[in-house]
């Protein structure tokens, strides 16, 4: 867990300028549940910065939700922006985080301003995300051209899966 007690948290919260300009509540902060990405998109710096699939790391769902609970109880946080490169990339880990938020009945809203691994989403997961407080998913669809996505930027995204998820 980050040493937020060493930061002027009230100043950050008062400024209320999270990663995304879209917020529902007033006491917003950022956190991460994972680090890196296993996709090898040509344009993305995540692989260069964090390393590829072999360096991709997820945090324990319990520790992620412990941190959320700590933020609620200590700082009065009521909204989280997950700044992961791909919050849903490890679907099992993502589901366990959601299950734990739901189990603890945490009153938290959250979003994924950096984007989300669309290829890991299905209707059931989206419904569970909403139940756990999600109000915004950012779909990182850099092109509407399937060939360009796969061959030029090397993004493992099947465009035919996107529209049904939005409906």
Regions from the PLM with identified roles:
Residues 2-167:
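Radical SAM [4Fe-4S] cluster-binding motif and immediate context
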């Amino acid at each position: 867990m980050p040493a937020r007690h060493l930061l002027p948290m009230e100043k950050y919260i008062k400024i209320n300028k999270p990663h995304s300009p879209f917020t529902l509540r007033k006491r917003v902060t950022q956190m991460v549940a994972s680090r890196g990405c296993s996709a090898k998109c040509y344009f993305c710096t995540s692989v260069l910065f964090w390393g590829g699939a072999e360096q991709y790391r997820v945090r324990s769902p319990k520790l992620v939700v412990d941190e959320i609970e700590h933020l609620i109880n200590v700082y009065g946080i009521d909204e989280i922006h997950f700044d992961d490169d791909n919050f849903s990339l490890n679907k099992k880990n993502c589901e366990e985080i959601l299950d734990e938020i739901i189990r603890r009945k945490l009153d938290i809203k959250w979003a994924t301003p950096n984007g989300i691994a669309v290829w890991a989403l299905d209707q059931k997961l989206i419904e569970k995300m909403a139940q756990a407080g999600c109000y915004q998913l950012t779909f990182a669809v850099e092109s509407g051209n399937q060939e360009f996505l796969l061959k030029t930027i090397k993004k493992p995204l099947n465009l035919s899966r996107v529209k049904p998820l939005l409906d």
